[in-house]
Amino acid sequence: MKEKLVAIVGPTAVGKTKTSVMLAKRLNGEVISGDSMQVYRGMDIGTAKITAEEMDGVPHHLIDIKDPSESFSVADFQDLATPLITEIHERGRLPFLVGGTGLYVNAVIHQFNLGDIRADEDYRHELEAFVNSYGVQALHDKLSKIDPKAAAAIHPNNYRRVIRALEIIKLTGKTVTEQARHEEETPSPYNLVMIGLTMERDVLYDRINRRVDQMVEEGLIDEAKKLYDRGIRDCQSVQAIGYKEMYDYLDGNVTLEEAIDTLKRNSRRYAKRQLTWFRNKANVTWFDMTDVDFDKKIMEIHNFIAGKLEEKSK
């Protein structure tokens, strides 16, 4: 019998964390974080990492497992998340895969084989030189022309993922989107229920802006400065939204006000890309979280998940 898996996806600031905890408590679940940046220790504020209090007793996995100086790929995530799903089942509990990093979530749900494609070091160095000469946006534009859907799922700051996508295209002759489409045509190895959370754009964007202000109040600048003072600069971790903008401020390239405004704009754009990515996935059932009675909405989603899992287990 297939192992059960609930995936909860959606844009930043839509409420995935709170929703997943409430559902996991009702369904005897454990949460596997599907966020590519919450794996890093010491990057709590900028990644909106869940606190111990917010976990409310629900076990969470794949958070704080890497130093910011280390890399972490979709293949690494798949290697860690896949056995965790089995382990959670063996404890008699229901695994929840929760996050906004679309490629990471899909790689587990459909067991992508992208990690098996070898590296092309010469081409990688060539692209790194291109970034040094022309910048991350120019590299992202290069991917956008070839594979716009993959580009939509990757922020330009995360140039290492952009390089990997271009590397895969060169090595296989297929875009990441084509590779993923082929994998997605194969049924998931899991008894899967996939939930998407959405919200009216104006409401979501207002939540994002307020979240950024809250991050700054809670110490985002000091958090970024600790990484900055460690000399962590070209690493994958600090290409994340929130840290790249603060580094520009710490370098003296922009004022703090400009950095905060850029962070808000980049976060809104990222949310738009996340929605584009997930809305192209046919197996997602969407729930609108705009101005809802939260407890009633949780019960609605709970009943949907329970019904789907029962239906699929027959």
Curated annotation (Swiss-Prot):
Instruction: Quote the record's binding site residues for ATP.
Output: 10-17
Site feature: Interaction with substrate tRNA: 101, 124
**Where do the record's region annotations for Interaction with substrate tRNA lie?**
35-38, 160-164, 239-244, 272-279
Gene3D superfamilies under this entry? 1.10.20.140, P-loop containing nucleotide triphosphate hydrolases
The record's annotation in InterPro entries points to: Dimethylallyltransferase (IPR039657), IPT (IPR018022), P-loop_NTPase (IPR027417)
Q: Which reaction does it catalyse?
A: adenosine(37) in tRNA + dimethylallyl diphosphate = N(6)-dimethylallyladenosine(37) in tRNA + diphosphate
Known EC number(s)? 2.5.1.75
PANTHER family membership = TRNA DIMETHYLALLYLTRANSFERASE
Record's protein name: tRNA dimethylallyltransferase
